[in-house]
Amino acid sequence: FKKIFSENYTCILTTSHELIPLMARSFAVSEDKIKVWGQPRNDGLFQKNDCREILGQLFPDLPEYTKTVLYAPTFRDYGQVQLFPFKDFDQKQLEAFLDEKNMLLFIRTHVAEQGSAAPYLGKRIRFLGNEQAEDVTGILNIFDCLITDYSSIYIDYLLTDKPMIFL
């Protein structure tokens, strides 16, 4: 069975050169049949997306800005995410900082927690929900920085070679 199965492949795709030997053994093919093509879902990260055009379409009333930050915490089955988990968190201080630095902060929560962002929203803090972007992966490259915890979104964002902050 393995011989018949493995002889029918022209090539097998993988995401990195390090996986070539493993994939070759797993599919019982020679390493030259393994091609590194990355993750198709990340193709959008390598396109030239116009940040102002995309955000302008999603949020027509945005104030002037120079930098954009995406805050994407992980969904937790055991309770609602606390978006700003600091005892000394000060909403007014965050808004003043964003205003002073001419920045926008976009909060992206799991679809089950969309209401949790409401108390934090304002002129420079916006909610980027499924209504605006069903899959945020294709537009990750429009953000200048990512803030997350242990969400796997950071793995895709690594491809942008931009700063990340882990909470």
Predicted regions mapped to residue ranges:
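Nucleotide-activated donor-binding/catalytic signature segment of Leloir-type glycosyltransferases, i.e.
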Residues: 113-131
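Alpha-helix capping/helix-boundary segments
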Residues: 18-19, 113, 152-153
